[in-house]
Amino acid sequence: MKTTFLDFEQPIAELEAKIEELRFVQDDSAVDISEEIERLSKKSQQLTKDLYANLSPWQVSQIARHPQRPYTLDYVAELFTDFHELHGDRAFADDLSIVGGLARFGGHPCMVIGHQKGRDTKERAARNFGMPRPEGYRKAERLMRLAEKFGLPIFTFVDTPGAYPGIGAEERGQSEAIGRNLYVMAELKTPIITTVIGEGGSGGALAIAVADTVMMLQFSTYSVISPEGCASILWKSAAKAPEAAEALGLTAHRLKALGLIDKIINEPLGGAHRDPKGMAALLRRALADSLRQFQGMSIDALRERRFERLMAYGKFKETTPGA
């Protein structure tokens, strides 16, 4: 698949286009231009490295939303075996914006749950662009209860702009469904490992992210509101989104510094979408390390650790100027 470049990546796009052109010429020419292709490839790689070393929060937000970025089902295919998807909340409908089911990780049974946005127009509409309705969260709760019953660890993957704010969703109890998931996950008697793989949008993300370990991919985001939404409220203009992204502190490094997440998983050069298999390999190691941490831990110790972790959110320290 041809790589889609973001606006701020245009210098890289131009170099890659030139390299592709030279490769095409070389195939139809007796002249050896392999050295020039290699030189430009190294230049493109260095340019990418320099650009990605100095990304603004707004640019990170754009990468987190990249249309070619791996989604939950892409990681399921790479990381898990024997995946059997489970459908429906047993109350209203099957919300396709949340996928989940039984699987094996490293040969051991587990439960996998995550947001799914969709690749093309038809699938995006069917999956509501990754914005769950109440039935999606209730499906997630049902699967988590099932995992608890059989003592299966739960892996969740977060990638949503937020919970769907439509009238029907509100009528069916959107806030209740989200709130119930927060309550249920805080009390579950099985390990929960969450990874933010793209966008972590507000309560819509948190409803499957109350976990024993929360990790973020290097160029993912996690925030109470989107930069555009924040800008529209504070400045009455979505054009102020770059400033809002800076103020929100939504990047993985910022959240790790604040103690809100446990680990950052580095992405391949240029982002996860440039090397999905490489990203999956890095994620596999991180998930295995996290799961190993909870093996042999008693249920009481696990829940106590989770409670202490949750209660640590919002702690602050008062300082006296000049002290």
Curated annotation (Swiss-Prot):
Its main location: cytoplasm. Pathway: Lipid metabolism; malonyl-CoA biosynthesis; malonyl-CoA from acetyl-CoA: step 1/1. It is found in: Cytoplasm. The keyword Lipid biosynthesis applies. The keyword Protein transport does not apply. GO terms for molecular function: acetyl-CoA carboxylase activity; ATP binding; carboxyl- or carbamoyltransferase activity. Its EC number is 2.1.3.15. Residues 39-293 form the CoA carboxyltransferase C-terminal domain. Keywords: ATP-binding, Cytoplasm, Fatty acid biosynthesis, Fatty acid metabolism, Lipid biosynthesis, Lipid metabolism, Nucleotide-binding, Transferase. InterPro entries: Acetyl_CoA_COase_a_su, ClpP/crotonase-like_dom_sf, COA_CT_C. It is an enzyme of class 2 (transferase). One of its GO terms (cellular component) is acetyl-CoA carboxylase complex. It catalyses: N(6)-carboxybiotinyl-L-lysyl-[protein] + acetyl-CoA = N(6)-biotinyl-L-lysyl-[protein] + malonyl-CoA. One of its GO terms (biological process) is fatty acid biosynthetic process. It holds the Pfam family ACCA. Belongs to the AccA family. Component of the acetyl coenzyme A carboxylase (ACC) complex. First, biotin carboxylase catalyzes the carboxylation of biotin on its carrier protein (BCCP) and then the CO(2) group is transferred by the carboxyltransferase to acetyl-CoA to form malonyl-CoA. Acetyl-CoA carboxylase is a heterohexamer composed of biotin carboxyl carrier protein (AccB), biotin carboxylase (AccC) and two subunits each of ACCase subunit alpha (AccA) and ACCase subunit beta (AccD). This is Acetyl-coenzyme A carboxylase carboxyl transferase subunit alpha. It comes from Burkholderia cenocepacia (strain HI2424). The gene is accA.
